[in-house]
Amino acid sequence: MAVAQELYSFPASKLDSFVAQWLQPTREWKEEVLETVQTVEQFLRQENFRGERGPAQDVRVLKVLKVGCFGNGTVLRSTTDVELVVFLSCFHSFQEEAKHHQAVLRLIQKRMSYCRDLLDLGLSNLSVIEEVPSSLIFTIQTRETWEPITVTIVPAFRALGPSCPNSAEVYVNLIKANGYPGNFSPSFSELQRSFVKHRPTKLKSLLRLVKHWYQQYVRDKCPRANLPPLYALELLTVYAWEAGTQEDSNFRLDEGLATVMELLQDHELLCIYWTKYYTLQHPVIERFVRRQLKGERPIILDPADPTHNVAQGYRWDIVAQRASQCLKQDCCYDDRDAPVPSWTVKRAPDIQVTVQQWGHPDLILWVNPYEPIKKLKEKIRLSRGYSGLQRLSFQEPGGQRQLIRSQCSLAYYGIFCDTQICLLDTISPEIQVFVKNPDGGSHAYAIHPLDFVLSLKQQIEDRQGLQSQEQQLEFQGRVLEDWFDFKSYGIQDSITIILSRKREGKAPSAPS
């Protein structure tokens, strides 16, 4: 195609014209394609599917949804691939869908092969594709020009009905279903479509430009490589626009293109997610998302399906190489032959860090996960004026409290979403110890190695209300005696001491 060679030689200042002239589809083409696909939709809505195997009841179509580029308004000129998600009455849960998915696909395939209206459109290549999730794919032809169109059908459980557009319970059920990542994403296709569909027209132009580049200069050049899906590039582009322009609809396409290319070069740092459709206030969802964000990067979580990292397992190194080449072309250089400036976009969004310290109000800071911890400590020092040694620690639900080291970053500890950090201000030779409570939580305390154990119990009583005579402290299986010092037990910096309510039968042990 001539267009494939033209983008790299097109002036950066004229990319708007490039999109309008070469990438924007004509109204006539879109109408011809959609009119043809409407025949498929009518077949699905009118047919009452029932087979000898699989679901025991009749299978009715609840809704047919156009997804992908035809659904979200970012279709490229002459695109001939249409995706349909079909919500079915026989699926009442994610588990039922997983159980009957293949049987339903075979049933639709069988009925479709006898449909006269589709046969009149040259129905061919009808087959089930074993992907994630499995789908039915076939080719038909437009009525006017007889152009071949590839249609993909994916059956899905309608998890989000009109009464619960984004219920936390739905996402808890999704997590508990424990499906293969992406297997149940079609259930959330309405949200996926809305995430892009209602964006400004200028952003859709940038999306078309990025997708055109990806198809012509990456996919076509490396047809056998395991490359990321277009959806991952779309989400990355949306993130670049949100973070780089503060969602301004008036921006330069060349700057947007250069920004996306630079992000692709830094793919190993990307950790991107949204909480537009679900909340981290629910403990099950919070624990799951935090675990997701600790995975190998790049991480781009589907905004509608947090179980699916759409960037996982692909050859991003190839995409990065192609992005580097793109940045050297005319489309990324201005009229003075200088590189087009890119937007300031962090490789992971800033997060809210709540700094907690006993006896002080919480301190709220916005921090980037890739910033060195020493920068965070400097922000705390400027806010609170501490002169002692700052000891920071954190504890995730169900985990152990960990010391945060100055030379590391929050990203090093896998922290990419809002978190709480404990601050302890110590003065040498004081050390920090973690005291783990019976409920699994823990607190940090400052102690002098030569202080008695009783001094720590008094701190615990002041903070937590449990009287010192009712406390039992253990370290390495030994109950600590009130009138011995910490050094005699070999207690060193940042170790964990177990707190429990004193019970009969286990006597304190003196140091050996």
From Swiss-Prot:
Principal location listed in the UniProt entry: nucleus
InterPro entries documented for this protein: 2-5-oligoAdlate_synth_1_dom2/C, 2-5OAS_C_CS, NT_2-5OAS_ClassI-CCAase, NT_sf, Ubiquitin-like_dom, Ubiquitin-like_domsf
Entry keyword set: Antiviral defense, Cytoplasm, Immunity, Innate immunity, Nucleus, Repeat, RNA-binding
Subcellular location: Nucleus, Nucleolus; Cytoplasm
PANTHER family according to UniProt: 2'-5'-OLIGOADENYLATE SYNTHASE-LIKE PROTEIN (PTHR11258:SF16), 2-5 OLIGOADENYLATE SYNTHETASE (PTHR11258)
Family: Belongs to the 2-5A synthase family.
Protein name: 2'-5'-oligoadenylate synthase-like protein 1
Source organism: Rattus norvegicus
The gene coding this protein: Oasl
